[in-house]
Amino acid sequence: MSEKPQQEEQEKPQSRRNSFAVIEFTPEVLDRCLKQVEFYFSEFNFPYDRFLRTTAEKNDGWVPISTIATFNRMKKYRPVDKVIEALRSSEILEVSADGENVKRRVPLDLTAARNARIEQNQRTLAVMNFPHEDVEASQIPELQENLEAFFKKLGEINQVRLRRDHRNKKFNGTVLVEFKTIPECEAFLKSYSNDDESNEILSYEGKKLSVLTKKQFDLQREASKSKNFSGRSRSFNGHKKKNLPKFPKNKKKNGKEESKEDSSAIADDDEEHKE
């Protein structure tokens, strides 16, 4: 009888850290693993990732590594002990002494990060109409890598974000592509924009794609939301007050007002790592 609790206690770490197939952690794999986690904590993701940010705020900046290991793009990195090993080599991140948690060495200046986000949006395009009807959740990581390879052949990019339907969390056929520079972004738009019929047609697996600026995409999304609220659509080129939905005043959560700007920014991000 006395051995059973001891056996269960020994099995818990095994379940948490070794529930997926073990892969060979070559130096290249360790580097990819580290860069992925550093991205989660970067100025381009952390301020706008509500789940990650609130988790850190509850624990003095620390986030459980076991939580990060459940993100879709991290599930392939097993055992988790190797992830911890990779994170210990980071110049940006710090691992707790017990190896259970990770945080930024230097906290982000959120105001500066939001200014960086504005500049980031200026070099981001929305590319729509990718095949998506038959894409299952288990196929998302592979699709992510395929789309990254697709766009890297066409320009210098920083990242590709897959958009999801907020109702069923499935890929909705739209990706946000962030380029390294504004000129790179403008050159891509000039080559593939649907506004000019003489432009080269951008396609993927035989399907013609549509290219919009981030601003055009946001206006289209707002128009769609407005139509859902009022039954009437708005022009993508302007805002008509009579068609704008009326939102209630910001509700207080835990004694603090929730920022409208913050909520809008979060809605722009895909949430692939939270499933």
UniProtKB/Swiss-Prot annotation:
- Identify a single GO molecular function assigned to this protein: tRNA binding
SUPFAM superfamilies the UniProt entry points to: RNA-binding domain, RBD, Winged helix' DNA-binding domain
**Where would I look for the motif Nuclear localization signal in this sequence?**
240-256
Compositional bias segments (type: Basic residues)? 237-254
Q: Which InterPro entries match?
A: La_dom_prot, La_HTH, Lupus_La, Nucleotide-bd_a/b_plait_sf, RBD_domain_sf, RRM_dom, WH-like_DNA-bd_sf, WH_DNA-bd_sf
Q: Where is the composition biased (Polar residues)?
A: 226-236
**Which key words are in the record?**
Acetylation, Methylation, Nucleus, Phosphoprotein, RNA-binding
| Disordered: annotated segments | 222-275
Post-translationally, this protein is described as follows, namely:
Phosphorylation is not required for the roles tRNA and snRNP biogenesis.
Q: What do the Gene Ontology cellular component annotations say?
A: nucleolus; nucleoplasm; nucleus; ribonucleoprotein complex
- Please report a single Pfam family linked to this protein: RRM_1
Subcellular location, record wording: Nucleus
The keyword tRNA-binding is assigned to this record: no
For the modification N-acetylserine, the affected residues are S2
Q: Which residues carry this modification: Omega-N-methylarginine?
A: R104
GO biological process terms on file = tRNA processing
Record PTM Phosphoserine, positions in chain: S15, S19, S230, S233, S235
Q: Where is the RRM domain?
A: 123-216
What this protein is reported to do is described as: Molecular chaperone that binds nascent RNA polymerase III transcripts, stabilizing these RNAs against exonucleases. Required for the 3' endonucleolytic cleavage that matures tRNA precursors and for efficient folding of certain pre-tRNAs. Cooperates with GCD14 in the maturation of a subset of RNA polymerase III transcripts. Functions also in the assembly of certain RNA polymerase II-transcribed RNAs into RNPs. Binds and stabilizes newly synthesized U6 snRNA as well as precursors of U3 snRNA from degradation. Facilitates efficient Sm protein binding, thus assisting formation of the U4/U6 snRNP.
Q: How does it assemble?
A: Interacts with SXM1.
Q: What is this protein called?
A: La protein homolog
